[in-house]
Design a protein with these regions (language model features):
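Proline-rich low-complexity regions
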Residues: 53, 114-115, 137
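Short secondary-structure boundary/capping segments
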Residues: 78, 108-113, 147-152
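Carbohydrate-recognition beta-sandwich/jelly-roll modules
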Residues: 1-92, 123, 130
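Alpha-helix-loop-beta-strand connector modules within alpha/beta enzyme cores
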Residues: 117-124
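The substrate-binding groove and active-site-proximal loops of carbohydrate-active enzymes
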Residues: 59-75, 101-115, 168-183
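Aromatic-lined carbohydrate-recognition surfaces of secreted/lumenal glycan-active proteins
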Residues: 63-66, 95-97, 125, 129-142
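Active-site-adjacent "subsite" loops/lids of carbohydrate-active enzymes
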Residues: 136-183
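Short amphipathic alpha-helical segments, especially helix-boundary/capping motifs
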Residues: 54-59, 94-98, 164-169
């Protein structure tokens, strides 16, 4: 365990742990991966006792990615929702997936794809859907949000702690919110 970020890799049959800042505490707990996880959880991240709302377990969850992939847009989302209802499926939670926003770290609708987001959400609610939006902890590096987050110290830093780390994930290069920051 470490309270600071660390890097883990497997090389030549060995597990390599690199903690640029802080220390790593090695503890043996249990004889299975489950037992080790339960011990680590109890010591470092105990369950809060809260669970998602009952709705997440009692109604279908639909996701627009299956229909639209990166082409999330108001017209096709409404067509998808109407087709669910028109084909006799129950409404439930409708998650609008990646690419509804202008860019990562910005939570405004793309106006070229969503001319009336409030109207769309109102229509989805009228059909009986609860609406969720896909978000991720990434921020486009060349953005106003990135600069503000960097100034506040709200981003994961690189190995030497001198600047925000820019990560290569499946959707390009992004900085990442530091979710360990108590602010």
């Amino acid at each position: 365990w470490s309270d600071s970020p660390l890097k883990v890799e497997i090389r030549d049959g060995k597990i390599i742990i690199d903690a640029a800042r802080g220390t790593v505490e090695c503890v043996e707990a249990g004889s299975t991966l489950r037992e080790a996880f339960m011990a680590a959880s109890a010591a470092h991240f105990p369950a809060s006792g809260t669970v998602p709302p009952d709705l997440f377990f009692s109604v279908p969850q639909y996701n627009t990615w299956i229909e639209l992939i990166y082409n999330q847009n108001q017209e096709d989302i409404l067509k998808y929702a109407h087709s669910i209802v028109d084909n006799g499926f129950p409404t439930g939670i409708l998650m609008i997936d990646d690419n509804w926003q202008k860019y990562y770290g910005n939570f405004e609708f793309r106006p070229d794809r969503f001319p009336d987001p409030k109207g769309m959400i109102d229509e989805l609610h009228a059909l009986g859907f609860k609406v969720m939006f896909w978000v991720c902890p990434f921020v486009s590096p060349d953005s106003q949000e990135f600069r503000w987050l960097r100034e506040k110290g709200y981003l994961v830093m690189d190995k030497d702690g001198s600047r925000p780390a820019v990560l290569d994930w499946w959707n390009g290069l992004s900085a990442c919110y530091d979710l360990s920051n108590p602010e």
